[in-house]
Amino acid sequence: MEESRIENYLKRRVEKLGGKAYKWAPVGVVGVPDRMVLLPGGKVIFVELKAPGKKARKLQEYRAKQLKDLGFRVECFDNIEKIDKLVSNIEIAD
C-alpha cells in the first residue's frame, strides 16, 4: 500500500470522528509530521505517515521529539491497522 493511500485513510477515519486531518507543512521548517489531526474536545495529534515498513528519518524523529517535549502527542503510521487502533482508542476514551 502506498503512503498516499494510508494518508487518505487517516483523513477519512478522522473525519468520521468529527475531526480534521490537515496537511501540515510550515514554511521554512522541514521534517515536521505530515498531518495535524484536530479532534473534538481540543485534542491534537501530529501524525507522520510512511509507506509500509518505512521508518521516520532522523530529522523527523527530532521534530517529533520537539513536539512531544511541548506536550503534544505524535504518532508514526505505516499501515491502516495502526490507524484503526488509534481510532478505537479515541472512541473508547470518549
List where the protein language model places each region.
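Catalytic phosphate/metal-binding cores of nucleic-acid and nucleotide-processing enzymes, i.e., regions
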Residues: M1-D94
